[in-house]
From Swiss-Prot:
Pyridoxal kinase involved in the salvage pathway of pyridoxal 5'-phosphate (PLP). Catalyzes the phosphorylation of pyridoxal to PLP in vivo, but shows very low activity compared to PdxK. Displays a low level of pyridoxine kinase activity when overexpressed, which is however not physiologically relevant. Gene3D superfamilies: 3.40.1190.20. One of its GO terms (biological process) is pyridoxal 5'-phosphate salvage. Pfam families: Phos_pyr_kin (PF08543). This is Pyridoxal kinase PdxY. Homodimer. GO terms for cellular component: cytosol. It is an enzyme of class 2 (transferase). It comes from Escherichia coli (strain K12). ATP binds at residues 112, 144, 149, 182, 209-212.
Amino acid sequence: MMKNILAIQSHVVYGHAGNSAAEFPMRRLGANVWPLNTVQFSNHTQYGKWTGCVMPPSHLTEIVQGIAAIDKLHTCDAVLSGYLGSAEQGEHILGIVRQVKAANPQAKYFCDPVMGHPEKGCIVAPGVAEFHVRHGLPASDIIAPNLVELEILCEHAVNNVEEAVLAARELIAQGPQIVLVKHLARAGYSRDRFEMLLVTADEAWHISRPLVDFGMRQPVGVGDVTSGLLLVKLLQGATLQEALEHVTAAVYEIMVTTKAMQEYELQVVAAQDRIAKPEHYFSATKL
């Protein structure tokens, strides 16, 4: 059965971030994506200027009411949330999650707790980080912080892989069954590799791939693609190891394609065949 995912995150008209980054790769893996946009901007914010607007929180709820009115909400297998335009949007998203789970008790909530990196040009509204700590985390089935977001969620520093696994299990004690640490950065084993962890109460998997050097301007949307693809693989029944290995390879294919084409925006369309069938392989290690 084809899986249906309600994806609630940002949208850019030009380029790739949020739904504009994740939607096509998720579809290329065989999932139906229902994109619901928290913001519509001309382009992503790392350009330093953009136009567009944040959607009113009620807009999100209204759209989902419309899907419920045609009796299709029970076919939704998961809700994915990413970049929020406001903390109030987060409250509405949790209401949507409750509504989806009432219609389909098997549905999952995947929270990508985007909290902003001012130095990277990713800006989030006041209250969004607090929303994720207090409400998003306990409501989620799967949560996918990067290292900075992991430290905010567990409220202490994380300095190495062992501490990251323990921190992920602290989050699991508060609600989610699965934690993806989608960029270990300085807490990883190696400074010249890109490393991730996938953790449950009784399993922990580590994977690494080469860093792709883009100089000063790193492409945006890598985390959005990573979260979306992981959710698709898990819904399709992949094991933790299989899901982590495929996602790591697929994202690497997008990165090397983007660099080879000398582009700043992720080249998800050009890399589409290698998203579905990656040419590279990276092996996950059980910790």
